[in-house]
Swiss-Prot record:
Organism per entry: Pseudomonas syringae pv. syringae (strain B728a)
Top-rank taxon, per record: Bacteria
Subcellular location: Cytoplasm
Name of the protein in question: 7-methyl-GTP pyrophosphatase
Catalytic activity, reaction form: N(7)-methyl-GTP + H2O = N(7)-methyl-GMP + diphosphate + H(+)
Pfam families to which the protein is assigned, alphabetical: Maf (PF02545)
Gene3D superfamilies: 3.90.950.10
NCBIfam families the record matches: maf (TIGR00172)
Length: 192
C-alpha cells in the first residue's frame, strides 16, 4: 500500500483522519488559497483540495495524498475564517436564525499513478436565533477565529445549532471521512 499523507496542518483534520486507524504523516502544503474572480464556492474548495494534494507530490512518490478545503456559505456569500473577535461577531450575527452550508472539498491524489479523485461534500447547519450576549459569551469561551463560519462544531459551537442536515457530519469539521473511505477503498486500501 502506498504511504498515506495528509496535506494539512489542521489539528482537526489530523484528529479526524486518526479515527480510521491507518498510519499517516502530515505535511502542510504551500499554495495560494485565493479565490479566483467569479469562482463558485463549490469549484473553489475542489480546486484547493486538489492543489493542496498535488503540491506535495514532488517530494512524496508512491503516496496517497489527501487534500481538503472548506468554506462556509451564507446567503450565497462565502464566509472565510474570521481571524478576530469582531469579524466572528459579524459572521454569527449575520447567521442568526439562518442556514449556513459548509462545502468541504476532498481530493485523494495517487502520486504513483497521477490519478486524483475529487469531490465536494455539503453539510448544512440551521442556526438558532442568537442574541448579541449569547454570541459574545460563545466567542469568549471558544475563540473559534480559525474556523470557517466562526464556530467549532466539535465543541461548544453545537449549542448555536437548531438542527443539521447532511450525509457526513465529519465534513462539518473539515474532512469527510465517509467519502474519504470510499476513495481509499477505490485505491485498494483496506478500511477497516
Amino acid at each position: 500500500m502506498p504511504s498515506l499523507l495528509l496535506a494539512s496542518s489542521s489539528s482537526y483534520r489530523r484528529e479526524l483522519l486518526a479515527r480510521l486507524r491507518l498510519p499517516f504523516t502530515c505535511r502542510s502544503p504551500d499554495i495560494d488559497e485565493s479565490r479566483r474572480p467569479d469562482e463558485a464556492a463549490f469549484d473553489l474548495v475542489q480546486r484547493l483540495a486538489r492543489e493542496k494534494a498535488e503540491a506535495l507530490t514532488a517530494e512524496h512518490h508512491h503516496h496517497l495524498i489527501i487534500g481538503s478545503d472548506q468554506v462556509a456559505v451564507l446567503d450565497e456569500q462565502v464566509l472565510g475564517k474570521p481571524h478576530s473577535f469582531e469579524r466572528a461577531l459579524e459572521q454569527l450575527t449575520a447567521a442568526s436564525g439562518k442556514s449556513v452550508t459548509f462545502l468541504t472539498g476532498l481530493a485523494l491524489f495517487n502520486s504513483s499513478t497521477g490519478e486524483c479523485q475529487v469531490d465536494c461534500v455539503p453539510f448544512t447547519v440551521h442556526m438558532r436565533e442568537l442574541d448579541r450576549a449569547s454570541i459574545e459569551r460563545y466567542l469568549h469561551a471558544e475563540q473559534p477565529y480559525d474556523c470557517a463560519g466562526s464556530f467549532k462544531a466539535e465543541g461548544l459551537g453545537v449549542s448555536l445549532f437548531r438542527s443539521t442536515e447532511g450525509s457526513d457530519a465529519t465534513s462539518l469539521i473539515g474532512l469527510p471521512l465517509i467519502r474519504l473511505v470510499d476513495m481509499l477503498i477505490k485505491e485498494g486500501v483496506s478500511v477497516p
